[in-house]
């Protein structure tokens, strides 16, 4: 900003449109897919205020303060998005506890503080409004705090080492939510209950994560070219979370061909892990209703783990135009063993002006 050093302000408005292939062709409509083969799909085809924040850095103190409307994955659990599949793109915590952790394009009132411990490490903490009203299609520009259930408090340590001249970035983080959370299965006495009203209400919820980005090789003439690996793991509170967590690994080779030094090829695998307590609850419900036929409308689908794989090639035609042909593969969409595996041919395009 003019006249202000180390200061930045940003406002972004987004609009998503189109149909979801995962919903229309891949997943069981009773469960949906944990991921989505189109990462840009989700949260409704509506206009939204996706960023409206002010950030100020205090270089002498090593502090950066940020306040305004933002999403959690912008500054915590952040990871690159080098795939079209959702579970191989960006902050993964939002995919396993989407009722609390909001990624783009959702925003909430928030503030966070980053303190640089030394040139290679920092510690960040934030306070984010926990308000499900912001996810509604009719609340794309909601600025009210009406409907807030509490706050979500993330903390993260970031380390940026170099091993033999190869850049790395490691994130160790966790969050605690003060919003009430209903037990997946049991009441206060530890007895299984199918009725939501009879289950125990916990006074909070937590998650922990680890993200690693490490370059493994590089070219002598261009250190940006070479093989890199991305790891992304997160674990949820098993008492209150239907999804226990997710694991992701991806390999990317940038500049594989001398004639295309800015292009890259990636292969990623992601697993979404279902809480065993959720499976137990659904099996119990089917037993009580004496339903065994999966086609019966009264049958409650049992959900297991879901696996997503994607191979893609990123073609950077120019600094402002990118094409990414890709082949995603989905195993047990929505954790449904009865479904056939799905192969998809996709194309991501990106235009920057």
Segments (PLM) and residue ranges:
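Outer membrane beta-barrel transmembrane domains
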Residues: 141, 154-158, 173-206, 217-218, ...
């Amino acid at each position: 900003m003019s006249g202000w050093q180390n200061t930045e302000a940003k406002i972004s408005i987004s609009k998503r449109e189109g149909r979801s292939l995962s919903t229309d062709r891949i997943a069981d409509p009773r469960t949906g897919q944990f991921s989505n083969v189109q990462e840009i799909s989700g949260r409704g085809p509506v206009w939204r205020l996706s960023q409206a924040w002010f950030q100020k850095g205090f270089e002498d103190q090593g502090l950066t303060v940020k306040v305004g409307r933002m999403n959690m994955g912008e500054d915590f659990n952040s990871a690159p998005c080098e795939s079209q599949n959702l579970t191989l793109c960006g902050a993964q915590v939002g995919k396993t506890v989407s009722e609390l952790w909001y990624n783009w394009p959702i925003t909430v009132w928030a503030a966070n503080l980053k303190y640089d411990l030394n040139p290679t490490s920092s510690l960040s903490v934030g306070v984010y409004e926990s308000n499900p009203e912001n996810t509604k299609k009719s609340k794309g520009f909601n600025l009210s705090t009406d409907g807030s259930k509490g706050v979500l408090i993330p903390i993260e340590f970031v380390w940026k080492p170099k091993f033999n001249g190869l850049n790395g970035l490691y994130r160790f983080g966790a969050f605690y939510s003060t919003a009430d959370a209903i037990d997946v299965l049991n009441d206060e006495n530890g007895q299984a209950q199918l009725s939501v009203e009879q289950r125990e209400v916990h006074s909070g919820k937590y998650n922990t994560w680890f993200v690693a980005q490490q370059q493994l090789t590089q070219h002598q003439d261009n250190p940006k070219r070479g093989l890199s690996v991305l790891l992304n793991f997160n674990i949820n509170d098993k008492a209150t979370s239907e999804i226990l967590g997710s694991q992701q690994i991806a390999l990317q080779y940038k500049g594989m061909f001398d004639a295309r030094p800015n292009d890259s090829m990636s292969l990623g695998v992601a697993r979404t892990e279902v809480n065993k307590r959720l499976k137990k609850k659904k099996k119990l419900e089917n037993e009580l209703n004496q339903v065994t036929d999966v086609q019966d409308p009264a049958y409650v689908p049992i959900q297991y783990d879901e696996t997503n794989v994607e191979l893609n090639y990123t073609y950077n035609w120019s600094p402002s135009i990118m094409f990414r042909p890709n082949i995603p593969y989905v195993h047990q969409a929505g954790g449904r063993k009865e479904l056939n595996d799905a192969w998809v041919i996709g194309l991501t395009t990106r235009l920057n002006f």
